[in-house]
Amino acid sequence: MKALLVLGLLAAVGYFVFHNGEDLDWRSLSASLTAPVQRIARHDSSDGLIHTGAACPPSHASGDAAVQFSTSPDGQAEALVLSVIDGAHTELDVAAYELTNARIAEHLIARARAGVQVRVVLDRSQLDGRASKLSRLAAAGIPVRIDLAVPLMHDKLIVADGDTTQTGSMNYTQAGAHRNAENVLVVWHHPELATAARAAWTRLWEESQPWTPG
């Protein structure tokens, strides 16, 4: 039950942030939080709605929303991020304070080579070259922008195929995945949340500057 309360609070905070606290549809928010809790109360974990520590997308009927939550430093959080990337078919919009994790960068490049539209916004700290995968992504043809409009762009966000959202505390780094105590939350197949997350990502993309080598 504590886990449900935590997820409910995370969802409420996310909803508030993505909507900038304005014109909130509280009835829709209440329904979106209540329905999953009611379904969990009626079913055990085999229902496929809430999963913890799993590295692969949950098994559920196409179009059904599901939530996964994983932590580091045991590698499960990184595996969950990779499952979101690998599961994308059309587009991946990424906003990252840091992107120095070689596995995550290579999986993004692999999806781009498979025809998925991949776009990445990074914080200005990635310009210093220390383990940044900025050049590697750009060399693979992935559009990369640097956010110079704010002092710190601290997001860790991926929106996949316009219906799946990944966020959490974990930076896309080796330390975040394998040394620090971090968390990753994924909401699969929830277009309304993904639309709000995509709008937040788009604001970052539009305020950022395209990066080119040299």
Residue ranges and their predicted role:
Residues 85, 97, 157, 197, ...:
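Short, structured motif recognition centered on aromatic/hydrophobic residues
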